[in-house]
């Protein structure tokens, strides 16, 4: 009863606060639909907010404003608006808007995804840039990725005629790719539901669900500490479960390094241990890497397979190119540069099915002017990568799956072409773009 009473008091208080703030809100915000008291525009979002945002952009333009509870949110919906947010005003708009449920176990303070652009964040980015996502490291790991891919193919052939959950097989393969990059060993045995990877997948997917679900504390700050729906507890449980998957491996490696003649494998875990990072920083960094590099990639590959099924001519064109360039042998990563149609297919998949339809929310560190509108300090900024990829003003016949549109185009997805930003851009661009490119 106490929780209900506190919630009612908070809601009544927020109503009056909303009415006061609405009268004194800063002028010059981008246009947007009229908000309701307390809930703002929350009821207009539905289950696929990126789709609703794209519809709102047709009415309100490049930038529009929403009220999500008491939170002011500005949404960028065109390449021009994305360029302004992610490039022209990158430094001012590089703050992170962090969900209340994720503020557990000091994860945010040690996360390359959620932390502010402070010294810890810079240190973690530097480790990734200079030790993990280097051209040399990518090339050295090419053989491992090819081996794991062939293991997946053999597993699928072995189970021909038997129903398999393809996304789980892809996920397990990607986990093993990262497992070998980081720990020099597999984490997942394909087809073995008792292995640690299945538990990891469940925890990571649950965290992504929580990140995409409404939490009253995110929109009504007075409710933030109550955890009314148990989301913060769920995230804490997920973090504990994921950390447990590789916790024993980290402990074992630390012991080996302490021994005078300890046999260490000189992989990425050794790099992390030698870099002076503590266990919390290592755990958060590994979680960021596994969650960003496995589930989202598996989802994108699943969409790619779906498009192949729906578009037999595209499948035939890819097969023809492979036979012409590669022949009947297995495809190697070194072949990709000579497969322009396959590259175009990947870009088209990312255009229509970006791994993160709405880029991770940013926050304005200071008030600034964007496209002649005022973006107030602490405002949340979202970039609709899904909507930008389907913008009829940018793309001809935008809903048609057509890799041919990229054959004579220089547009790429590495953060310089704002028509295609599946991995973001600016200082917050996904640090794993190079290996992501290698995988798909």
UniProtKB/Swiss-Prot annotation:
Keyword annotations from UniProtKB, A to Z: Alkaloid metabolism, Heme, Iron, Membrane, Metal-binding, Monooxygenase, Oxidoreductase, Signal-anchor, Transmembrane, Transmembrane helix
Any one GO CC term of the record: membrane
Membrane topology (UniProt): Single-pass membrane protein
EC number: 1.14.-.-
Source domain of life: Eukaryota
One Gene Ontology molecular-function label: oxidoreductase activity, acting on paired donors, with incorporation or reduction of molecular oxygen
InterPro entries found in the cross-reference section: Cyt_P450, Cyt_P450_CS, Cyt_P450_E_grp-I, Cyt_P450_sf
Subcellular location: Membrane
Principal location: membrane
Binding sites annotated in the UniProt record for heme: 430
Entry's Gene Ontology BP terms: isoquinoline alkaloid biosynthetic process
KW Ubl conjugation (keyword) present: no
Pfam families in the record: p450
Transmembrane segments: 2-21
Cofactor(s) demanded: heme
Keyword Nucleus: no
The protein's role, per its UniProt record: Involved in the biosynthesis of benzylisoquinoline alkaloids. Probably involved in papaverine biosynthesis since its transcripts are abundant only in cultivars with substantial papaverine accumulation. May catalyze the 3'-hydroxylation of (S)-coclaurine.
Family membership: Belongs to the cytochrome P450 family.
Designated name of the protein: (S)-N-methylcoclaurine 3'-hydroxylase-like protein
Source species: Papaver somniferum (Opium poppy)
């Amino acid at each position: 009863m106490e929780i209900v009473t506190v919630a009612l008091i908070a809601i009544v208080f927020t109503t009056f606060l909303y009415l006061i703030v609405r009268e004194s809100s800063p002028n010059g915000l981008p246009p947007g639909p009229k908000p309701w008291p307390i809930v703002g525009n929350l009821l207009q979002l539905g289950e696929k907010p990126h789709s609703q945002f794209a519809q709102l952009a047709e009415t309100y333009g490049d930038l529009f404003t929403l009220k999500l509870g008491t939170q002011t949110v500005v949404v960028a919906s065109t390449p021009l608006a994305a360029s302004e947010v992610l490039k022209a005003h990158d430094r001012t708009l590089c703050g992170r808007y962090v969900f209340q449920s994720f503020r557990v176990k000091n994860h945010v303070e040690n996360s390359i995804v959620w932390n502010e652009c402070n010294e810890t964040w810079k240190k973690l980015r530097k480790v990734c840039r200079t030790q993990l996502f280097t051209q040399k490291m990518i090339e050295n790991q090419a053989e491992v990725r090819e081996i794991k891919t062939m293991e997946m193919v053999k597993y699928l052939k072995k189970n021909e005629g038997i129903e398999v959950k393809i996304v789980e097989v892809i996920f397990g393969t990607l986990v093993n790719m990262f497992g070998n990059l980081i720990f020099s060993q597999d984490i997942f045995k394909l087809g073995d539901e008792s292995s640690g990877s299945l538990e990891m997948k469940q925890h990571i997917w649950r965290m992504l669900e929580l990140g995409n679900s409404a939490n009253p504390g995110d929109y009504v700050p007075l409710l933030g500490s109550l955890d009314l729906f148990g989301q913060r507890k769920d995230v804490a449980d997920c973090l504990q479960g994921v950390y447990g998957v590789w916790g024993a491996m980290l402990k074992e490696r630390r012991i080996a390094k302490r021994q005078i003649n300890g046999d260490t494998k000189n992989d990425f875990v050794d790099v992390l241990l030698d870099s002076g990072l503590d266990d919390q920083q290592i755990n958060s960094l590994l979680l960021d890497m596994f969650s960003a590099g496995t589930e989202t990639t598996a989802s994108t590959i699943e969409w790619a397979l779906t498009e192949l099924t729906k578009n037999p001519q595209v499948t035939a064109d890819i097969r023809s190119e492979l036979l012409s360039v590669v022949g009947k042998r297995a495809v190697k990563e070194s072949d990709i540069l000579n497969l322009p149609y396959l590259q175009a297919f990947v870009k088209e998949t990312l255009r229509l099915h970006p791994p993160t339809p709405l880029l991770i929310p940013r926050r304005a560190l200071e008030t600034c002017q964007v496209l002649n509108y005022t973006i107030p300090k602490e405002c949340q900024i979202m970039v609709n990568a899904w909507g930008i990829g389907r913008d009829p003003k940018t793309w001809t016949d935008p809903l048609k799956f057509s890799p041919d549109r990229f054959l004579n185009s220089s547009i790429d997805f590495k953060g310089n072409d704002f028509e295609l930003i599946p991995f973001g851009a600016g200082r917050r661009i996904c640090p794993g773009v190079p290996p992501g490119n290698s995988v798909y």
